[in-house]
Amino acid sequence: MNKTLVILFSINIVTSQPVLEEFYYGDVDRQYYLYIPTTIEPESPLVFVFHGFTSSAENIMEYSGMNEIAETNGFAVCYPQGTTDNNGNTFFNVGYSFHWNQTVDDVGFIIALAEHLQAHYNLSPINTFSTGMSNGGEMSYLLACEFPNYFRAVAPVAGTMMESWYNTCNPEYPTPIFEIHGTNDNVTWWEGDPQDLGGWGPYVGIDDIIQLWRTINLTETVVYDTLLDINLADG
């Protein structure tokens, strides 16, 4: 697919074995992988990486390459594991129509986990970031809407914003956005799906999402960059 990068704000920001950890929140035992570089300074950044629908923390850790980047640049990476819905699919609760009866509080879980990791590993509370693929990208947008004071910037990949919370997204603080999306994405459509033809629930098109964050961030200009599809087999 053709891929377009949208930058609303410029940010600058293997050898250690990732460890599967457990964290109890909301009467549920949650799991996550944590990667700490072999050498890391106090108050280093923390990056959350969220997997997609039906995927796993281990899977996105393996294919994202974030551990190698963290090792080189000196930041911690956390890969939270979603819970399982009634059909046995792993997910983060962002409001899909078929998850209307799911009560898991993923936002609360991530905020509590961030505070735990910041305190336990002496990581920076003001340099916490989020990215994710598809459902994980939507989780990043949701966190930016609801807890912008916790996340310095977010970088959703192939994600969108559900209409149910797009219409109420009015954060107190601006959040830099690095939006990555395929213009021919046949799962999460670039133009959105307000009629819910795809069955996920009504969601917003990428152009509308960018316009929303331009307004929130008081951004006068948006930088678009288009990349060629160099791997036709990657979906």
List PLM regions with ranges:
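Conserved acidic catalytic loop of the alpha/beta-hydrolase fold
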Residues: 108-126
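Cap/lid segment of the alpha/beta-hydrolase catalytic domain
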Residues: 81-105
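A domain-start/cap signature at the N-terminus of enzymes
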Residues: 15-46, 58-64, 69-73, 102, ...
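Serine-hydrolase catalytic-loop signature spanning alpha/beta hydrolases and amidase-signature enzymes
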Residues: 54-56
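The feature captures the conserved acid-bearing segment of alpha/beta-hydrolase catalytic domains
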Residues: 152-235
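Sec-dependent N-terminal signal peptides
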Residues: 2-16
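Structural cue for short, hydrophobic secondary-structure segments
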Residues: 49-52, 79, 179-180
